[in-house]
Design a protein with these regions (language model features):
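The feature captures the beta-strand-to-loop junction immediately N-terminal to the Walker
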Residues: 17-19
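Helix-to-loop junction immediately C-terminal to a conserved catalytic motif
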Residues: 32
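Conserved ABC ATPase signature
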Residues: 92, 118-122, 126
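Conserved ABC transporter NBD signature motif
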Residues: 40-48, 57
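Catalytic Walker B motif of ABC-type/P-loop ATPase nucleotide-binding domains
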Residues: 143-147
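ABC ATPase nucleotide-binding domains
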Residues: 218-243
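Conserved ABC ATPase "signature" region
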Residues: 81, 96-114
Length: 243
């Protein structure tokens, strides 16, 4: 990344898009506190990430990575309950309220049916839903997700995006996520940040960012673009005219 400057306001639903290697995962890891900003500054509510208590910051911001692996044989229910750890004192266990919150998060993500199975025994798509359930149980102000629909079939892609939309609308939760599917990005996100070679190429409403010339330049491919009545787009690459 270079020459990046952006801000996210409370309650926004922001999609970060761009081709492979454009910097999507890097910028989300910065926002999630996984990477250091290096010579730059990264602020939450005007305070540098480095100057904030990590446990308190975890109550406000949750990070959902693209890939998940566990060295220990945790059950699905235990993974979701980990979302409550920022609220627990040292050497204390989850209480009834924590268990209820985790149960509700599993219901919302349809993961309750395999709550007692081992996390490493379930499919990649199921793991993604479990990790998102844990993020919901964390009850953050901001949720940062790196391609949360990448391992899901279309049914669960729509389900997860609808869940995030509901959290955004009902709780005013700020959502920032990387996406590859430009159709879904245009349908669910209210703001899109289009990256190209580590820089912000376009930033604005989906109908402003997802212009034919912008997509062709950044993705280096000629396309046919159809804009639906709801503002979402359908893209048909002309494979015979790849630039």
């Amino acid at each position: 990344l270079h020459s990046i400057s952006m801000d996210v306001q409370p309650g926004e639903f922001v999609g970060v898009i761009g081709p492979n290697g454009s910097g999507k995962s890097t910028i989300l890891k910065l926002l999630g506190g996984v990477l250091s900003a290096g010579p730059g500054n990264l602020l939450f509510k005007g305070v540098d990430y480095l100057n904030q208590n990590r446990k308190h910051l975890a109550r406000s911001i949750t990070w959902v990575p693209q890939e998940h692996s566990m060295a220990f044989p945790f059950k699905v229910s235990e993974i979701v309950l980990m979302g409550r750890h920022p609220y627990l004192s040292a050497f204390t266990f989850e209480g009834e309220e924590d268990i209820e919150i985790a149960h509700s998060a599993m219901e919302r993500t349809q993961t309750l049916q395999f709550a007692q199975r081992g996390f490493n025994e379930i499919s990649g798509g199921e793991k993604q839903r479990v990790v998102i359930a844990g993020a919901i149980a964390q009850e953050p102000e901001v949720m940062i997700l790196d391609e949360p629909t990448s391992a899901l079939d279309i049914k669960y892609q729509i389900q997860i995006l609808n869940i995030l939309k509901q959290l955004n609308e009902d709780r005013n939760m700020t959502v920032v996520l990387a996406m590859h599917d430009l159709h879904l990005a245009s349908k669910f996100c209210r703001r899109l940040v289009l990256l190209n070679e580590g820089e912000v190429f376009q930033d604005g409403a989906p109908e402003e960012v997802l212009q034919k010339d912008h997509i062709e330049k950044v993705y280096d491919i000629r396309i046919q673009l159809v804009r639906n009545q709801d503002g979402s787009i359908m893209i048909s690459p002309d494979t015979l005219c790849i630039q």
